Amino acid sequence: MRYLITGASGFIGPHLVRQLAADGHDCRCLVRSREKAGPLAELGAEIIEGDITLPESLDDIARGMDGLLHLATLGHMSNFTVTEAMFEKVNVQGTINIMREAVKAKVPRVVHCSSVAAMGICDDVPATEASECRPHHPYGRSKLKAEQTVLDMVNTQGLPAAIIRFSMVYGPGDWRDMLKLVRLAKKGLFPKIGSRPNLTPLVHVSDAVQGILCAAEK
């Protein structure tokens, strides 16, 4: 099968492309810069330079694809100067742009990777898909709005999409806050953040990849 992957040069993307290649699938990776796409090219992926916020760079990008795996996002830890408008541009409008290409190309299966941040503060424990979402951060609000646009296209345009909300993903190649915490723990240090116990759900990147593939295949 042939898969189009957005956000392929991020943290999860290379792990996903590696697994798809090992399973005998062909990958087309959308990246903003070829400079970061070397490892993907080494895995045999087709590299397409483009930007989900620029519709003209996406024209017919999904043609001939059997699946779209949409990972591209502007994360809440990307930069402390990120504004709500920037989250809206990338996470919401960017999602609309790539989903329109999927509809146009009649891609038979689409997976939209979202975040538990879309849920925000939830009174239900454990939470379910039916739990009320009250995101309190601009990032979470943008992820929820992106989900809603995908669902609207499912209902109005027949987009064959599944949505996955990931918690904190960790594993090899992770350069973000989890790496900093692990390094501190190895030194016998573990900072207490906040004034009360804080539980964070974690998922290993290999499990995240398997979740994406299951959603794509079912």
For every predicted segment, state its role.
Residues 3-23:
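N-terminal Rossmann NAD(P)H-binding glycine-rich loop of SDR-like oxidoreductase domains
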Residues 6, 30, 68-74, 110-116, ...:
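SDR active-site strand-loop-helix element
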Residues 34-41, 45-93, 101-104, 119:
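NAD(P)H-binding glycine-rich loop region in Rossmannoid oxidoreductase-like domains
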Residues 93-139, 154-155, 162:
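Conserved Rossmann-fold NAD(P)-dependent oxidoreductase catalytic core, especially the SDR/UDP-sugar
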Residues 136, 167-175, 195-205:
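Glycine-rich "substrate-gating" loop/helix at the edge of Rossmann-like oxidoreductase active sites
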Residues 142:
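Active-site helix of classical SDR
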Residues 147-172:
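Conserved beta-loop-beta element that borders a ligand/cofactor-binding pocket
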Residues 182-190, 200-218:
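Alpha-helical substrate-binding/gating segment
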